[in-house]
């Protein structure tokens, strides 16, 4: 059954905002969460980015706000600055007609400026745990009138070490309040927070089959580590994405990839947690404006980003878990548009491919490694399309005489071929250096291997002659040697 926002009996101010934002039908997480939020129930929601969860908690939160009150009435706790900004922008849009005042609070921004903004009596605070707790300790934020608390991406805050800060923040909130907790997974520390600070919460869960969007084409390429960069650049040449995000597993990888892409002639910038907030915001603005065509990011830096127009996602490194994969590809295929996601799998990472497919309930199609000739053909097609566009604009009178002179000496096909050659960006083979990353193996696969070794399988000693056991020890030594040298080893791509 389709549920529309009219079914929630919202105020006219909120309906104006919802209609202006283009919302029509409620997503599964919205259909289940909004009625519970409006009735002041505590909610535990398991949902991924891209499912509409910000509106799921934002609509009931804003509906209950009294814009005339000078008090902080709701707080939203988010793991990263980017997500805090994104959530605050969404809440501002939802509450614009109601005149609800929303203020983002995060580290990296001048605290004096934040204190001045807090004196203007915001109704809703969206902040990162550390900076929120800082203001609470300074008494520049008082939570004694808060009636709604939202924890967004609670598992990510746990991974980033914010669990103690969250407990301290919640301890400052009145006991009579509503709590909405959203988390892709429910590890034990998150469950303990729910038990301690929530009252008979209702559970809302978006099933795995609803996690990935049908209008995202998902592919994988089996490629050796040393060939990954050339594979990436050839795909960029063939597919010519309007806006692309490339995901790397580490900060070092992001820095090296961004530098290497620029060396090869692609406009690229990287974002990760070690960059200052100002630098990250500059990179994001350039990406949104199309000044750069490729954004290279870590998982944490990309959390909560809502950038329209992303056509391609490249998982240069396999994500550390299937849930991160869903977060990554959710950057494309938004607002009803189609998108493509390509994941590079090294031979030792096939277990991660299986784990991702089991989680998403969807098989990825295999894509063959692109060749150099295919990359050149891709760039030729870009040139041909540019020529067609120029011809259709019909503003060529100034060039007609020169064209006629060329045709007197050469046939038309030769002239056009020369023009295409001159205008085509040929694949660049500038040498680049990338540090190898260790392959990512599924935890389930690791556990299976460990279990087999404990059971005496896989070449271990089982009470027979010691030969197989000696070989296993030798293999382990070789593996350890490879790992220790792998941190220092660098590859050269051409």
UniProtKB/Swiss-Prot annotation:
Positions occupied by motif Q motif: 3-31
PROSITE patterns named among the record's database cross-references: DEAD_ATP_HELICASE, HELICASE_ATP_BIND_1, HELICASE_CTER, Q_MOTIF
EC number of this enzyme: 3.6.4.13
CDD domains in the cross-refs: DEADc, SF2_C_DEAD
Group of enzyme by EC: hydrolase
GO biological process, one term: RNA catabolic process
Helicase ATP-binding domain ranges (all copies): 34-204
Start and end residues of each stretch annotated as Disordered: 429-494
Cellular location(s): Cytoplasm, Nucleoid; Cell membrane
Summary of subunit composition and partner proteins: Homodimer or oligomer. May interact with RNA helicases CshB and DbpA (DeaD). Probably a component of the RNA degradosome complex composed of rny, rnjA, rnjB, pnp, pfkA and eno, and possibly also rnpA (although rnjA and rnjB's presence is unclear). Interacts with ribosomal proteins L1 and L3 (rplA and rplC) and the protein component of RNase RnpA. Interacts with the RNA polymerase core.
Name the UniProt record assigns to this protein: DEAD-box ATP-dependent RNA helicase CshA
Organism for this UniProt entry: Bacillus subtilis (strain 168)
Gene name, Swiss-Prot/TrEMBL: cshA
